[in-house]
Amino acid sequence: FQEWSEARELDWYLLENPDHKHMQNWVKKLLHIYQKNPALYELDSSWGGFEWINANDAERSIFSFIRKSKDGKNNLLFVCNFTPVERSDYRVGVPKHKTYKLILNSDDAEFGGSGKERPVNYKSVSKECDGRPYSFAYPLPGFGVAVFRY
């Protein structure tokens, strides 16, 4: 295939390749999530819109953080695994005792992942983790990214 050029159309035939189609699905979903979630853009240039949950899990190469909206509602929790090892019961600390809704899972089949069924809602419990008073466990896939709204 040819390198991208503003002078010609994209190589749309590449979408016949499943890997290219999976990447298109991923980018499409990311753009949709960006448009629908003010936490990703309202406080983009302020530290008030970002909070680390855990940036120090070097042993497992996993980090987690929160993106916040101005009104504090519909914040997003990101959990990212940078190893091929699935963490079947990865516990992540969270700031509030509520339900966290999975809105993006990179392991979904539409993105080329395993397509394993996972619950959508995760209720936090009063179990301290990552310096937070509450937490929940999630089956984090290898090389996976999970995004939760709360």
What does each model-found stretch correspond to?
Residues F1-Y150:
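Carbohydrate-interacting/catalytic domains
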